[in-house]
Amino acid sequence: MLTFIFVNNQNFIQPLEKAFPNYVIKPWNYETDFTLYKQNSLVLASSDKELTYLSHSLLPTIAYGTPNDTNQLFGSDYLVDSLEELDSALLETVFCRYHHIPLTIAKHKDFVLREITFSDLDSLWQLYDKERNNPSINWFPFSPENKTERELFYQYISDSYRFYQYGLWGVFSPDTNILMGHCGIINSNIGNDFCLELCYFIGDNFRRKHLAFHACQSIIDYCKKMKLTTMLYARILKDNTPSIGLASTLGFSMIQSLEDYDLYGLPL
């Protein structure tokens, strides 16, 4: 768990303490011993020299710019123009990405929406088993026994969440951590235009409990918070009455009727 935020300027300690009261803000310099902080810390740096030094510390970093800055700041995966751009979500994201901890997207009394991990693949396959011929579901890789599909799954887990900050997430029981379905955002196209599409699947044993509505609403809220798009889409087969009703309840409206499915949109 992220506990300590190290900053390289004493003048920033008090403002950071005020902005992030849940973390311990500590100063650092080239003599700081980070040995005891490797599992629960993040370091802020503002120069190429500092980032080069920190590359050997085995700690996650965020680079930040300063007025009249001439540094390239290529030594960190994360860069903000100033410390004022920091927020708790970014700090937690950087920390979790570095330590390969799945990010939690939303929490609800009935579910936890979080990133899928390698260890979830077998549970995902068991969940899909009864629905393998369902044409309305956007699947993760279909068979974990297939080496190529398993490798594609690993690649998705490794790259998609990190690069896009969205994807298909797991819907887990908050009490038992049982995987109940998936729900999320996929890249898609309308004609030649790129768009983001809402997708969901709830396992048969967990339906009729309003999980799909609350999970999808959490994703809509996430899209707004992250400013991912100004219009979210959903493709629904014409005979999928439950999904049509869900889309309407969420605020989607049909914008185009095609041969096999209807296209719905929700302005954000």
Describe these PLM feature segments:
Residues 1-108:
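Asp-based, Mg2+/Mn2+-dependent phosphohydrolase catalytic module
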Residues 38-40, 166, 228-229:
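Short, high-confidence coil segments that cap the C-terminus of an alpha-helix
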Residues 45, 65-67, 235, 248-266:
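Conserved catalytic-core motifs of GNAT/GCN5-like acyltransferases
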Residues 52, 244-245:
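Alpha-helical segments flanking ligand/cofactor-binding loops in enzyme cores
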Residues 177, 210, 240:
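Conserved G/P- and acidic residue-centered "switch" motifs that form tight phosphate/ATP-binding loops
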Residues 206, 210-219:
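Conserved acetyl-CoA pyrophosphate-binding loop and the N-cap/start of the following alpha-helix
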Residues 233-244:
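Conserved beta-strand-loop-alpha-helix junction that forms the acyl-donor binding cleft
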